Amino acid sequence: MTNKNSPNPNIEMGGQCNKPYACDYQDRCKSLLPKSDITPFTVLPYIGKDKKLIEFMKSQGTTDLQKVPSKFFRDRKDYAPGYHKIIQDHHKNNKPWFSLDLKNIFKEFSFPFYFMDFETVTQGVPIIKGTKPYYHLPFQWSVHKLESIDKEIKLNDAESFLDFEDQDIERKFIESLLKAVGEHGTVFVHSSFEKSVLDKLKDKDNCKDLADKIDKLISRLKDTLKIVRKNFYSPLMNGKYTIKNIIKAIPSNISYDV
């Protein structure tokens, strides 16, 4: 429970804002900070919260991303080589970065393209037979279809599924999904979440007869998170690779702003 009229804590933002859980009011605190044209070093994935880097930047009296020495940069196999340097450089020139491979990567994918997203819910007291407390129950999917490169995806063209109470919800979820994505084309997801849901569904007693079809769907999945991490960055993303941040950086008529 919170008191909206209580004063803001007289303490600087720091690691405590995310421990033991992320505070829901960080945006409120950030809005009170002095406005600055400086991009903070905390946008750097993984090392932005590194204790040694934080102590170094404190000793220098700055939070400026451009002041981070390269000795702190680290490579990760799921990101572009030198991605910390890429982020630093492209915040400096305020331009997006593309790998030379990006165009060729998409040439390898076959149309139609399907863009698939799942939502799950955890129930403290499960109401669906065969589930347990805090089991991730899939209750919603949406699929947007792109027939060819010269077509345009419209939001109202999406197919979707939504159910909360049907005792056979998982069976209906996967049956309707398999029908929506057909048997051909490339299915894009953002992260491994959708695959993990499909893997669990094919082992459910009421879905085992669909296991082969689910496996074929899984074989068509392409993870856009992996593609973006290795091949694209924009200062508008502020070091984050979520769909909400990527949308800000690419030409689109879609917005997550409320």
Can you annotate each of these PLM segments?
Residues 97-183:
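Conserved RNase H-like, two-metal-ion catalytic cores of nucleic-acid enzymes
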Residues 30-36, 125-128, 231-237, 258:
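Short conserved micro-motifs at the rims of enzyme active sites and ligand-binding pockets
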Residues 79-105:
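Charged, flexible boundary elements
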Residues 9-17, 101-106, 258:
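Short coil/turn segments at secondary-structure boundaries
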